[in-house]
Each structure stands twice: as structure tokens, then as C-alpha cells.
Amino acid sequence: MRTLAVSLLLAGTASAIALGSQAIDISRYTIVDLSHAYGPSTVFWPTSPTKFELHQLAFGMTPGGYFYSANSFATPEHGGTHIDAPIHFSSKGRTLEQIPLDQLMGPAVVIDVTSRAAADRDYRLTPEDVVQFERRHGTITRGTIVLLRTGWSRHWPNVKAYLGDDTPGDASKLSFPSYGVDAARLLIEQRAVAAIGVDTASIDYGRSTDFQVHRIAAEKNVPGLENLTNLDKLPPRGALVIALPMKIEGGSGGPLRAVALVGK
């Protein structure tokens, strides 16, 4: 069981985070941003009818003599660095605001398949990959956040390189690596991980037409973290990941700001 407290209290100039009776000196950690910024070049699924839009409402000096700016924004749930809530692929799954915070904050492992993905852009993580990882780095324990590093974030935001095809409205020719079905079952059903994430557009590989990994995860109320970046800056294990989405009532997903704390 993980002992990470849900409430993080920033302790003034000491730059310490109080975790129950413990304290973490933030200066002893490197904070790694795992999220792409939202903007005009943000990558969305080809069938998405819209993309991220930022509309300026105000920008400039006011009659009162002070500066003021404000915007409105609109975005599909599933694009950019975002989370898939279980209801995305299960009618009985949790909606975005129902996901327990302790599934989104905790110890992470990073499984590196960059060399395999470089040789086969449709590569899918296998159970043997997981077993080999555990032989080298120890068993993946209950409540772990699993991150799959394929090296694909290097293509962002080149849509054709990242997704394998840039035809608007057509998702039939996508090509990128991700989790394989059997590996997903091992991690979710046997290891009981808290969440799975990847530095590609989907927790299913690009050519998937039945989205079995999404369905397996949703059935167990395991969220998916997609379009992550900077996984090369994390160790195979030992990082603490905090992946907090917008709290959208009834949402099937939403924008995600994910960070990792790595000991210096």
C-alpha cells in the first residue's frame, strides 16, 4: 500500500512539502514537467472536430489605470497531454472528477522500449518486456503508476511523424507504438497498477481498431495518461509522479498537468 498523503501543504520559505508527519525538501529534487503546452500546434486525434482554441477577452490598460488581461478557451477532452477517465471506454467507469487522487499521485516506473519502437513504429509492449524490467528493477507493486517510454515525444508536434498520418478526419492509417493487450492485462489485472501512461497519442497502439487496452483499463477503473513528454528524464523507478487533470464534472477525460519529482 502506498502511504502518500493526498494533501500537500507548502511550507513557506523552507520549500518543504509536508506529507503527514514527513517532510520533503523540494530543493533536493528535480521537478520534471511531463506535459506538452496547449496551443495552436497541439496534436489531437484526426477525427476530432475541433482543436484547442484560445480567445482573447481583454488585454490592455483599463480606465482605472491598471493592466488587465483575460481569455476564454475551448478544447476537446482528448488531445494534448491529457487523461482518459474510465468512462471513456466503460459505461460503468468513473468520470473524471470521480477518479481518486491517490491513483494520480504516487511512485512511478518507466519501461523503456525506445530501441524496439525505433525499429518498429507499431511496437506493442509485451509481457516479456515487463518481466525483463522486473528482473532488472524489481517487481512492479500494487498502486504504481506505469509510464511507457517509446521516445515518440521527440516527434511532437509534427502530426505526420507523431501519428503516422496527417489526413484530417481519417484515423485508419495511424501508426505509433504503445501497450500490447497481454502486457496491459498483466499490469492492470495482476500487478494492480494505479494508472498507465505513455509518450504517444494513445494507450493503444496506432493501428488498433478495437481499443482493447482502453477497455481493459476502463473495466478496472484505471486511468490512462496520454501524450506525455520528458520520460527520458526519469529513472526506471524512484520518481514520484503527480498527474492532476482539470476537475470536469462528468468528463470522459481532460487536460492534464503531470510532473515528476526525481531525487538529485
Please provide the spans of the model-predicted regions.
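Active-/binding-site microenvironments in catalytic and ligand-binding cores
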Residues: 17-264
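Intrinsically disordered, metal-sensing/regulatory segments
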Residues: 3-6, 199
